């Protein structure tokens, strides 16, 4: 749409120039040239405008700038490629077609019966022996792509952290979200967790511990009581 608007403005400006300079009147030539330049300016300006609605986010893809470092997918310092910063609701200016592509995506919705499983496609490599990135103490910060990739030192790959019910504006080029069912532990039952994340407990007498403390890797000694849980069931296997 933006490129079409730019082309219409260019055609209109050329047509005005042609009409003005075909006139024998000097004043018409000058006036037509000014009008053509004004039309071209307005169409160029309007073609840079993008609107993002309340239930959408805008992914910015930049077509000029430095190359991304090897192995990097998301730009955090103005390199060309998908940008870490997303566009929120409202009008956004100076995003000319040809220089930028804007991909409009719906916000991520997680219902009360669901949990959002997160996989990051960029970031630091997972520590050796880890299949999931550790849970974040501040999950809100984790979802800020710039923070995740810079000072947060987020890890690429499956995340132990999840999206709980709600609406989320996040960079879907960085975070892939798969919706799964929340876990319900009925009354009169408990849930036993086998954790695939966390530190492995120290072996005792040469044997690997089978029952571990909460937060360690293995079968937790502390069960979960009846409740609705929003957990990554790939990272935390629950048996009722």
Where are these regions (language model features)?
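N-terminal hydrophobic membrane-entry segments
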Residues: 1-240
């Amino acid at each position: 749409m933006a490129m079409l608007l730019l082309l219409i403005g260019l055609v209109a400006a050329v047509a005005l120039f042609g009409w003005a300079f075909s006139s024998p009147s000097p004043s018409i030539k000058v006036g037509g040239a000014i009008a053509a330049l004004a039309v071209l300016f307005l169409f160029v300006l309007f073609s840079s405008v993008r609107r993002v609605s309340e239930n959408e986010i805008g992914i910015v893809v930049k077509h000029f700038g430095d190359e991304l470092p090897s192995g990097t997918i998301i730009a955090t310092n103005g390199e060309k490629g998908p940008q870490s910063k997303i566009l929120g609701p409202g009008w956004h200016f100076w995003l000319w077609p040809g220089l930028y592509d804007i991909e409009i995506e719906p916000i991520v919705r997680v219902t009360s019966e669901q949990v959002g499983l997160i996989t990051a496609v960029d970031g630091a490599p997972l520590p050796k022996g880890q299949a999931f990135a550790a849970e974040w103490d501040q999950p809100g910060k984790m979802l800020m792509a710039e923070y995740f990739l810079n000072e947060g030192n987020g890890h690429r790959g499956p995340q132990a952290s999840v999206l709980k019910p709600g609406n989320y504006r996040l960079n879907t080029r960085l975070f892939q979200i798969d919706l799964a069912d929340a876990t319900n532990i009925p009354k009169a039952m408990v849930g036993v967790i086998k954790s695939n994340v966390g530190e492995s407990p120290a072996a005792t007498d040469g044997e690997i511990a089978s029952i571990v403390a909460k937060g360690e890797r293995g079968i937790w000694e502390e069960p979960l009581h009846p409740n609705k849980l929003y957990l990554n069931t790939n990272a935390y296997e629950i048996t009722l």
